[in-house]
Structures are given as structure tokens and as C-alpha cells.
Amino acid sequence: MQSIILIGKPNVGKSSLFNRLARKRIAITSDISGTTRDTNKIEVQIDGKKALLIDSGGLDESNELFKNVKANSLKAAKNSDIIFYMVDGKFLPDDEDKAFFYEMKKLNKPIALVINKIDNKKDEERSWEFSNFGVKEVFNISVTHNIGIDELCMWASKFLNENFLDADDEEDFESYLENFDENSGDFKLKTINENHIKVGIIGRVNVGKSSLLNALVKEERSVVSDIAGTTIDPVNESIMHKDKIIEFVDTAGIRKRGKIQGLERYALNRTEYALTNAQIALLVLDAAEGFNELDERIAGLAAKHCLGVIIVLNKWDKSELDFDKTLKELKLDRFKFLAYAPVISVSALSGKRVHVLLDKILEVFANFTQKIPTAKLNALVEEATRAHPLPHDYGKLVKIYYAVQYDLAPPKIALIMNRPKALHFSYKRYLQNQIRKQFNFEGVPLIIVSRKKGSKDEQEG
């Protein structure tokens, strides 16, 4: 697919134009210079033609971090087909802007000079100052007021192939409704794309999430720096691994409460958004620095969203911890609510054991989407209740008529009972353990609900 890159100095409106063309808020926008530090990508439709739109980090050399951002942006421009070079029409052009623009022209690609923030006649007069850039394709636009954008898109359309969007290309996100048929005793399972796995990368600031993403995709996709909070936007990247598409979302670092301000607060919300759209969470911990309460709170996000979970001990090569003791601490103490999660030690910077993590993602996804045959499930429940009978409810007999798995990702099991409210949480935990012993649900939450026969009302646990 052909690509269009938005490039220019910080705070010229690249992310605002990106959001406008994407028709939704994806990139974080702010008056603070340098808000976008990574490249965001999304498929868009330009005059009925498919294109990959890329929002790059600002071109700036004021410090080491922004030099890295600039290098990433220039690399993305070299791999793009069309360049929108954006400038701020509220200011007169400077030599730095001109130098960056000429650097883009050397790539010999279709390039447009896009002068943003042209909101009135006075701004339009000022835009003539950019004529010395020596480019034919100049577009005065105002993203805020949606002026001039159609003309820009029509120009770009001339360089795009006639590859029209099909309705089948758009994913169907219709809400799923659980249907229980009393007569058949069957539930309607949601459809899962078994060849596309969505993975969220979570963890507190500077534990190595961006380095891990780069190691996983073998490309410097996210800007990596020792400066805490380098990544602001969630950065999506997809790879193929053993014939499966794995889509990663590198979420913004999560700061301690009380220190979250402005962009960080919005980025924290974006972390929640990323997990809402993920199936598996990689909980990244800093093995060299050790673990703290904030790690536990972040882990709770994965539990809250009922995702598959893999605990990743990053920087293990710099750690002096004993693996068995660390595993015991994680499973029995700090993260006992994620006792089902496998623990993988890696070094993101060196790439050591990253291949093990990729294989584990496939395994956990298979567990996340597996369906237990109803006959086998009922045989297991019958044996479990015989070995450990259900407690009576104030002298009344409590009975499970049958069990059925009614959903995937995560797996959910319904127990059809005469007195569903009488099922104690400890007995649910007992049944969960029995199911895990017989079926491989490593890395996956297992949800059990109790329902009265002939009713959709449930008691979940």
C-alpha cells in the first residue's frame, strides 16, 4: 500500500491533520512542542483510494532525544511515497525549515509544502513569504477550520494507485449478544480471527517497553531514550510469526498518581484504550531495578480487562535476582491475582530470549481462544462435585445441572444450577483449579458464572 507522510518541525499541526484525515482522534495533540515522538500509522481513504497515513515526530535538534525523533522521521520519509511537508503559517519561514525542506526534496518523491494555520486574509498574505522555498505545490490550509484540505487530498490522489476500498476490508465491530437457547442448552460463541493477535505492552515508565517493541519487530519503531516518559502515543506495529499476525501496541508509560499532568493524563487514558482493544497484555517489569506497588497497580489493568497475560522480566542480564525466588515472589505475593500468567525473562536491548516471548504469545492466544467440548467439561464438573460436594444452602440442596462454555477470549463457563446465588466464590475457585489441571489455560483468566435454569441472570466470579 502506498504511504503519505506528514513531516515538519514540532507543533505545526501534523497530528491535528493526521486526526482530521483519519476522522478520529488517534495522535495526541497539544500546544506543547514535541508532543508526537513516534510515528503513528493508519489506513485512510484519499479520494476513494487506499493509503497509509503516517504522522511523524517533529524535526528538531535541540537535544539528544529530539535528534533521535528526527532520525526516525527522516527514515520514515525515505520509505514513504508522498510527502506533506508542514509549516506554521503564523510565523515567517526560517533557515532551519528551508534546510529540512530541501533535505526532503532530495528524496525525489512527490512533495507538497503545506502551510497550516492560514485562518484569515492576514495569514494568507504572510504565506507568500514561503514562495522562496522554490516548490510548485503549495497548499494553504487550516486544520482547525477544515480549509484547503480537500485540495491537498485531490493533489495527493493523483499519485495513488486505483485501489479502491472494499466494504469487506473494514472490520466488523458489532457488539456481541449472548444468546442462550433453553431447549438446545447451547450458547452463541463470538467469532475470533485466529490469525490476528492483538498485544498490549504495559508497564511503568522506563522499564523498557519501547526497547522491547523494537526487539520484537526488529526495527527502531519507538523512540528509545533514558528520559522517562519518552513514548506518548500508543504505537502500533504488526509482524508475522509462524503464519500469525501479531499486532503490538506500545502504550505510554504510566506515572505515579499526583505526577500525572496534561499529556501524561491523556496518555494514561490511551493505555486503557489500547488494552480495551488488546487480547494479550505483556506486563513489562524492570528486573534490574526491582518491583514496587505501581507495578501491581498496572498489572491490575490487565486483570481488569480480562486479558491473557505474560509477565516479562526485562533487563534480566543486569539483574542479580535468583529466578526461582523471583518467580515465587511474583506468583505468591505481588501478583498472586495473576498466578496463571507465565513469566519470561528477556533482555530487550540485546534481543536475548525475545523469540521465546513470541512463541509464548502464540501459546497464550491459543489458550485464550480455546473451546472445551461440552461433554468433556460436564464430565470434569461431575467428577469434581463428586470428589468435593457442593455445600448446602441453609439446609437446601445445591445442584449443578450442567456446564457449558458460552464465550471465548477470555473463556467463560456457565454453570446451570437450581440455586445459583448459593455458589460460594471459594467453590468457583476450586472448579477453576480443576479445569486448569485438565485443560491448558496458562496465561488466561477463566471466568465462571452461575445461572438459574431457564434464566439469563447470572452470578459472575
UniProtKB/Swiss-Prot annotation:
Can the keyword Membrane be found in this entry's annotation? no
Q: Which domain of life is it from?
A: Bacteria
> Mind listing the UniProt keywords for this protein, alphabetically?
GTP-binding, Nucleotide-binding, Repeat, Ribosome biogenesis
User: Which Gene3D superfamilies does the UniProt entry name for this protein?
Assistant: 3.30.300.20, P-loop containing nucleotide triphosphate hydrolases
The record lists GTP 2 as bound by 203-210, 250-254, 314-317
State the Gene Ontology terms under molecular function: GTP binding; ribosome binding
- Where in the numbering of this chain does the EngA-type G domain appear? 2-164, 197-369
Q: Any one Gene Ontology biological process term? A: ribosome biogenesis
What SUPFAM superfamilies does this protein's entry cite? P-loop containing nucleoside triphosphate hydrolases
Ligand binding (GTP 1): 8-15, 55-59, 116-119
Which parts of the sequence belong to the KH-like domain? 370-454
Please give the subunit comment from the record.
Associates with the 50S ribosomal subunit.
Which PANTHER family does the protein's record reference?
GTPASE DER (PTHR43834:SF6)
Task: Sum up the protein's function in the record's words.
Answer: GTPase that plays an essential role in the late steps of ribosome biogenesis.
User: According to its UniProt record, which protein family does this protein belong to?
Assistant: Belongs to the TRAFAC class TrmE-Era-EngA-EngB-Septin-like GTPase superfamily. EngA (Der) GTPase family.
Q: What is this protein called?
A: GTPase Der
* Organism, as annotated: Campylobacter lari (strain RM2100 / D67 / ATCC BAA-1060)
